């Protein structure tokens, strides 16, 4: 199968779905059976999946150690990985390994424990990233969260499942020109 044929067919392939498997370590994926959907994932002659989507949501992953190696074992063309769903895990940072997938266009990280807004900056190197979710992380509580993300990731067209509007772009551009930094929202203290 030519590279062009692969790109055309794999986009339509169902995801390799390891969601709701209580996976604790990325290495466990090698021995874990993926969930089956209405359409089965096709495999190459070597047994690797012919898909560009990997769903790891609703597990208990707290790091992505050995992610590249495991993805290479699972996918025939890991370099073409376009969609990664890591939502509802226990991640506290955006692992730099995610920035090695230059064809990544959809990345779901909502419902984790990411607490430093600066983590978002790592994703700026992904030229095709268009859809990103981060809601449900502690960073969402920072004032200016949306503007900060859109300022640093100007190619995003969908953020937290909402389309990016012209007004969003305009506000993000103002933030960028003015060098505005987001502020942590402080919990109100009861005054006696």
Curated annotation (Swiss-Prot):
Location in or out of the cell: Cytoplasm
Q: Which domain of life is it from?
A: Eukaryota
The residue spans of each LRR repeat are 49-71, 80-101, 103-124
**Residue ranges occupied by any LRRCT domain in the UniProt entry:** 137-175
**SUPFAM superfamilies hit by this protein:** Outer arm dynein light chain 1
InterPro entries, A to Z: Leu-rich_rpt, LRR_dom_sf
* Transmembrane helix in keyword set: no
Q: Mind telling me which Pfam families this protein's record contains?
A: LRR_9
**Keyword Cytoplasm set for record:** yes
- Keywords on record: Cytoplasm, Leucine-rich repeat, Repeat
Q: In which tissues is it expressed?
A: Widely expressed in adult and embryonic tissues. Expressed in the developing choroid plexus from 12.5 dpc and in the epithelium of the developing airway tract from 14.5 dpc. Also expressed in the postnatal inner ear.
Gene Ontology cellular component list: cytoplasm
Q: Which PANTHER family match?
A: LEUCINE-RICH REPEAT-CONTAINING PROTEIN 51
Q: What is this protein called?
A: Leucine-rich repeat-containing protein 51
Q: What is the lineage of its organism?
A: Eukaryota, Metazoa, Chordata, Craniata, Vertebrata
């Amino acid at each position: 199968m030519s590279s062009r044929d692969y790109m055309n067919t794999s986009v339509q392939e169902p995801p390799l779905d390891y969601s709701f498997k209580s996976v604790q370590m990325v290495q466990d994926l090698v021995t874990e059976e993926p969930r089956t959907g209405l359409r089965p994932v096709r495999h190459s002659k070597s047994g690797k999946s012919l898909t560009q989507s990997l769903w790891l949501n609703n597990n208990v992953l707290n790091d992505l150690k050995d992610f590249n190696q495991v993805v290479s074992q699972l996918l025939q063309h890991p370099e073409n990985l376009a969609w990664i769903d890591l939502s509802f895990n226990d991640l506290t940072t955006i692992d730099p390994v995610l920035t090695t997938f230059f064809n990544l266009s959809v990345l779901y990280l909502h419902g984790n424990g990411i607490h430093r807004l600066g983590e978002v900056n790592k994703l700026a190197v992904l030229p095709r990233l268009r859809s990103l979710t981060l809601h449900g992380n502690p960073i969402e509580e920072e004032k200016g969260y949306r503007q900060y993300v859109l300022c640093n990731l100007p190619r995003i067209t969908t953020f937290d499942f909402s389309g990016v509007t012209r007004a969003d772009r305009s506000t993000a551009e103002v933030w960028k020109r003015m060098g505005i930094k987001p502020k942590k929202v402080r919990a109100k203290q009861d005054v006696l």
